[in-house]
Amino acid sequence: MIEHFDVAVLGLGPGGEVAADRLLKAGKNVVVFERELIGGECAYWACIPSKTVLRPPEARTEIERAAGVSGAELDWAATAKYRDYMIRNLNDQAQVDGYTKEGAVVIKDEARVTGPGRIQAGDREITAEHIIIATGSNAVIPSLEGLDQITAWTNRETYTTSTLPERAVIIGGSAVGVETATFLARFGVSVTLIHRGERLLDREDARVGELAHQYLQEAGIDIRLSTSAARARREGADSIIDLQTRNGDPVGEVGADVVIFATGRTPRTEGLGFEHAGVTLGDHGKVQIDDHCRAGENVWAIGDVTGIMPFTHVAKYQGRIAADAILGRPHPATYDGIPRVVFTDPEIAGAGLTEEQATKQGIRTIATELDLADAIARPWTYEQDPRGHLGLLADADRKILIGAWAVGPMAGEWIHHASLAIRTQLPIDTLLDQVAQVPTYHEAYQVALEQLDLTP
């Protein structure tokens, strides 16, 4: 028997959940499909467990750097126990029950599109007026000779492990790689971080990469730049990676108990039949969407599967965009100023354009960088030997902020000041009229804005 619904949501990660919740509250008849766990990658294997295990080392650092406090010790067993609580011990029954109570039909199976408005999941055939594709992404492990001989992890094994390795090699120096390096090193693991680029976090401003490199080295992490894995092999209990330069020249080897691949993600679209609903797939299987998250007639796509800023908060935002379009109150998605945070120690945050991106767009820019300890009191009241930098990027002609980055304690919390300014295109004169609480990290914006020379 064919079952019919107003909306079918394929994938219940953060984006799918937001869309489903919004539609259910509006009285729509909704069916949701989830092949693994409701909450998706973020809730069980990425954002939530990673930030949970990063917090104890961060707290220890705060205690070590604060005057008059000592004695903080890390307890991995207790940390792992709380992490397991946070990821619900990989059990989503409460979420299944919750959606059922809200009136949704929950199907725990992989859904495949078989035609316009038609979906097959196991032996169930579904039709729907609207389909929302929210199938997420998969971790990428590059093809590597000898890969099957070594102990290879992705974020999933890393953030659900009950036992920490003594030595780890991490391949990839973007956000996941440097966060993972921070977590493991702070818990006493000997970490080697391999990155094929010339600097860490190479999608951020160059200065951000420099500061990240400095702080990771201070944490005892062995960083190998302009280096990649040539092949893998096992020697006894050791997983060995033979290294090469960007030109392919051999440059030694490194051994560890585990090799962690932080080498990106790819949209989960293969074999799911989206083309049968008129969906166009781009590079690496990205679902092509317009500014209302429309992927085809009565088909919508949100989150990692679109390849647009693959962050949880963006997926949730797109979930609102798609649901509102279905409900007849459309408004276009815009991505200016959306924050991005790397939860290292100290934190790294950014919003808007980098200087390189702005230059490529032909924008005449003015930039400034502030050493927080030289400019405001809060870093000194927060910790001894204070850390922290803030960079601002302005459009010299429009006299608005178009980019910002911050490296320092809780940077992910106070980057939102810049994020809102960039997103709303607030004039810098208006920002200068802001009165910041003293002493707070927000005060740094006032000092940095004063440094921007916007005279013609």
Model regions and ranges:
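A Rossmann-like FAD-binding core segment of flavoenzymes
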Residues: 105-108, 112-120, 188-291, 353, ...
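Glycine-rich dinucleotide-binding loop and its adjacent helix/turn
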Residues: 47, 135-190, 194, 219-223, ...
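FAD-site-proximal beta/loop scaffold in flavoenzymes
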Residues: 148-164, 254-325
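Glycine-rich flavin
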Residues: 2-5, 22-28, 33-164, 197-201, ...
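Flexible, glycine-rich terminal cap/loop adjacent to redox cofactors
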Residues: 10-36, 48, 52-59, 343-354, ...
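Beta1/beta-strand and adjacent pyrophosphate-binding region of the FAD-binding site
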Residues: 1-13, 164-174
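Short hydrophobic core segments
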Residues: 8-10, 111, 126-136, 170-171, ...
